[in-house]
Design a protein with these regions (language model features):
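Conserved N-box helix within the HATPase_c
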Residues: 244-255
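Flexible, glycine-/charge-rich segments associated with ATP-binding catalytic modules
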Residues: 2-48, 60, 69-75, 99-103, ...
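Glycine-rich acidic phosphate-binding loop
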Residues: 291-298, 310
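Cytosolic nucleotide-binding catalytic cores of signal-transduction proteins
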Residues: 223-227, 262-265
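Signal-transmission coiled-coils
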Residues: 16-226, 234-246
Length: 410
């Protein structure tokens, strides 16, 4: 709280609250994957990126900052949420410092790139810190269905906004930060124009296999089948961000999902059915289906797997630097779904209780169709936080059947 107040006081000359009000009136400008590629082509211009980001970043920051202010007061008072707010205030102020700088001032342009890198690093722990705030709130005040629904709505939008802001920061810093990536010379920033989907899936499997072997002393094998309908016989390639795809498949593979379920469901038999992955590339979609025989989950629990407030894992320690990112928060699946949805794809789960689960990732096959999905602060969003959620308009079954012998007709 003190840090946030100090930042607001130090920024009073720049009227940060007024700037947030001003920039939140504008809608973010979603970019397609093709536009990201054009920005980072051989003719990439740092000045052009500078002029775009100094306008776009305040809009994206301000839009989500307005939504943060609509959270329950007790959640806003948690130390973790206060810390996240302070990061956003500080980052917005630093971007606004370049509002009146000339794009012809090379020193200012280079200084902007340094600032972008600093902001990117500052926001490294936004996701686990906000998650910690949700845990602090839940432990202190409990959670009711209405608050849970509002927090779920907010966190989906907040984390999607964070993914989009980080994408802009990464692209600019990787392209103009002066450090080339020798391991991926053909990447344009964080984007691979010819992302080999099968290779990324195998990388995700191998990483998850290491964890599974360490914990269970064994692991299910991978059976991968691919079908390129678009270009038969050719490698399965799309324009995509490999780190996003890796995050999704690793999360689905790793110990807390397909591998763990398979190992624990078949522990008595000591025979571990393989995990089947089918990859297809059509004219519109690239689809990855992962199937395990880990026993599945009941239909009523599917939605809970994507609920931020539902996690039953022990409270993690954010300050433990060696911990796996998001370990213990139960955020792996909901964040993975946001990565899929970010460029107009999706991630869905289909479960057969007693048998296993199918997870399906949808990705747009064309770079022109892969367009950012961005939250915008407007009247509809405001109403969602302020609306009174009334009783369900469908009858709710009671836990005990009605005794019809005592029933009287009207």
């Amino acid at each position: 709280m003190r840090l946030l107040r100090a930042l607001l006081r130090s920024a009073s000359s720049g009227s940060i609250p007024q700037q947030v009000d001003f920039y939140s009136r504008f809608s973010p400008s979603p970019l397609s994957m093709k536009q990201f590629l054009d920005f980072g082509s051989e003719n990439a211009c740092e000045k052009t990126s500078f002029m775009f980001l100094r306008q776009e970043l305040p809009v994206r920051l301000a839009n989500i900052m307005k939504e943060i202010s609509l959270l329950p007061d007790n959640l806003l008072r948690t130390p973790s949420v206060q810390l996240v707010q302070s990061w956003y205030v500080q980052s917005l102020q630093e971007i606004l410092d370049f509002k009146d700088k000339s794009s012809e001032d090379l020193e200012a342009v280079h200084s902007f790139t340094d600032t972008v890198i600093k902001i990117r690093n500052r926001h490294n722990d936004v996701i686990p810190t906000m998650a910690q705030g949700a845990i602090e709130y839940k432990e202190s005040f409990g959670i009711d269905p209405v608050t849970s629904q509002n927090v779920q709505y907010f966190l989906d939008r907040f984390y999607m906004s964070r993914i989009s802001i980080r994408m802009l920061l990464n692209q600019h810093s990787l392209l103009f930060g002066g450090k080339n990536n020798p391991a991926h010379p053909k990447h344009i920033g964080s984007i691979d124009p010819s992302c080999n989907v099968v290779e990324v899936i195998r990388d995700g499997y191998e990483s998850a296999k290491i964890l599974c072997d360490l914990y269970y002393m064994s692991s299910p094998e991978l059976i991968l089948e691919e079908l390129n309908v678009k270009s038969p016989g050719q490698p399965m390639q799309v324009v995509y961000v490999p780190s996003h795809l890796y995050h999704m498949v690793f999360e689905l593979f790793k110990v807390c999902n397909a591998m763990r379920a398979t190992m624990e469901h078949n522990a008595d038999r000591c025979i571990y059915p393989p995990i089947h992955v089918h990859v297809t590339l059509g004219n519109e979609d690239l689809t990855v289906k992962m199937s395990d025989r880990g026993g599945g989950v009941p239909m009523r629990k599917i939605d809970r797997l994507f609920n931020y407030m539902y996690s039953t894992a022990p409270r993690p320690r954010v300050e433990t630097s060696r911990a796996t990112p998001l370990a213990g928060f139960g955020y792996g699946l909901p964040i993975s779904r946001l990565y899929a949805q970010y460029f107009q794809g999706d991630l869905k789960l289909y479960s057969l209780e007693g048998y296993g689960t199918d997870a399906v990732i949808y990705i747009k096959a064309l770079s022109t169709d892969s367009i950012e999905r961005l939250p915008v602060y407007n009247k509809a969003a405001w109403k969602h936080y302020k609306a009174n959620h009334e009783a369900d308009d469908w009858c709710v079954p009671s836990s005990e059947p009605k005794d019809m012998t005592t029933f009287r007709s009207i």
